[in-house]
């Protein structure tokens, strides 16, 4: 598999076909059984929005934690803080521990923090739709901008219409084999 700038690869296959495993290998979370993976540039992996979320920490502290997990410096995180906080729409709740948030509020925070990065290579396990209808519209626009700015997109999905909209290449996986 070789991808170059401008490539938009859609991964399709049944549950358990290897889509998420491939994304995790591309992200560096898994070592390949054979061969090697070489990636140039910053990888942003939107595989698990809840990764790194601490229910006992405040919303603000969770934004900082997610930023560090994404490889951002403290200065970069603080520079993005106002934008992320505003996007969440959570206002004073950001000073409260996440365990006091509803599931929708937690999803807003996790999505805003996870998508506040730049990506040379963007890995997505399904198209993300979080929150209520109004927030989903905002989230969709934000995701589109992230996808447009990414040099390379690898999107795992079950939805053929998404492949047609966003991908210029498709790889069908079955049992971990293309």
Question: Residue locations for each model-derived region?
Answer:
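Helical segment within the ABC ATPase nucleotide-binding domain
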Residues: 136-149
């Amino acid at each position: 598999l070789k991808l170059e700038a401008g490539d938009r690869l859609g991964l399709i296959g049944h549950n358990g076909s290897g889509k998420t495993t491939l994304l995790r290998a591309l992200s560096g979370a898994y070592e390949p059984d054979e061969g090697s993976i070489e990636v140039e540039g910053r990888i942003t992996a939107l595989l698990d929005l809840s990764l790194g979320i601490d229910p006992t920490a405040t919303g603000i502290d969770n934004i900082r934690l997610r930023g560090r997990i994404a490889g951002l410096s403290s200065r970069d995180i603080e520079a993005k803080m106002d934008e992320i906080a505003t996007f969440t729409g959570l206002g004073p709740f950001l000073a409260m521990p996440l365990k006091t948030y509803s599931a929708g509020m937690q999803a807003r925070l996790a999505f805003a923090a996870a998508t506040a990065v730049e990506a040379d290579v963007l890995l997505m396990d399904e198209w993300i739709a979080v929150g209520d209808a109004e927030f989903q519209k905002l989230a969709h626009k934000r995701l589109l901008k992230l996808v447009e700015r990414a040099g390379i997109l690898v999107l795992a999905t079950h939805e053929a219409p998404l492949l047609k909209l966003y991908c210029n290449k498709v790889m069908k996986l079955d049992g971990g084999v293309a």
